[in-house]
């Protein structure tokens, strides 16, 4: 299973798209937000027939203020309408902001460190605890020892015990192996992880994890199809 990750950087968007909205609205948050809306809507349309889910990085939209929030809500609704499972990567301590309110995503990433309070969600919603993040300074805290395991693994155990799925940003198979060993029944959302390094996350039937690919957001439909084929080939080797 492969998810489209939308975490767009303004300077990587098609310059023609950016220029069109800048000409229309003038430079500023509105032009950038509308460029992100167009970019996201086109990709969701391409991905919907091929992929099961989309992950939207909240901060990339909220940089545009209230217009960015409107775009985020609009893209979530658009993706759901086209049959995609929607996850907002917010790393929040208040999941209901993204699973209820005006956004109504199917799932949301949360920070695990406030404790089990962040695992509370409606029955039809999912919470993904961001136990391993990919920012450069993450190991300063997440790799500290807590008893016989690193802190992020201790957090993973606790979050899984309270019913949360787990999110990890890692390109290392050892991290995935350790995470799966500590939380054998948890569903894993793996970002920035290729299919080969993610193999330990899957069971013998190719289930138990979802990979998120942020390179597809700058690719065309052919690239999405190629990524799906490659992952299917890897997983069926199990």
Cite the ranges covered by each PLM segment.
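Structural preference for beta-strand elements that scaffold enzyme active sites
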Residues: 1-5, 52-55, 85-87, 107-109, ...
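Conserved N-terminal beta1-alpha1 strand-loop-helix module at the mouth
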Residues: 1-71, 80-81
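Short, acidic/polar
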Residues: 32-47, 95-101, 152, 198-199
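A C-terminal functional module that forms or caps the active site or interfaces directly
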Residues: 171-215, 219
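C-terminal functional extensions of proteins
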Residues: 207-238
């Amino acid at each position: 299973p492969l998810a489209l990750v939308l975490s767009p950087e303004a300077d990587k968007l098609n310059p023609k798209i950016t220029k069109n909205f800048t000409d229309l609205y003038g430079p500023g948050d509105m032009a950038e937000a509308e460029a992100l809306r167009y970019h996201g809507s086109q990709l969701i349309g391409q991905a919907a027939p091929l992929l099961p889910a989309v992950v939207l990085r909240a901060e990339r939209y909220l940089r545009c203020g209230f217009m960015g929030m409107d775009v985020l809500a609009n893209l979530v609704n658009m993706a759901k309408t086209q049959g995609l499972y929607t996850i907002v990567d917010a790393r929040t301590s208040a999941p209901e902001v993204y699973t209820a309110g005006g956004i109504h995503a199917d799932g949301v990433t949360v920070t695990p460190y406030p404790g089990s309070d962040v695992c509370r969600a409606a029955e039809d919603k999912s919470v993904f605890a961001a136990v391993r993040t990919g920012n450069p300074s993450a190991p300063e805290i997440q790799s500290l020892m807590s008893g016989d395991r690193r802190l992020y693994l201790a957090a993973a155990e606790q979050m899984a015990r309270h019913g949360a799925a787990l999110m990890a940003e890692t390109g290392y198979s050892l991290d995935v192996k350790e995470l799966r060993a500590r939380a054998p029944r948890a569903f894993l959302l793996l970002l920035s992880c290729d299919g080969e390094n993610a193999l330990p996350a899957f069971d013998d039937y190719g289930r138990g994890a979802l990979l998120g690919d942020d390179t597809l957001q700058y690719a065309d439909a052919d690239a999405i199809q190629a990524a799906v084929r490659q992952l299917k080939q890897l997983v069926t080797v199990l």
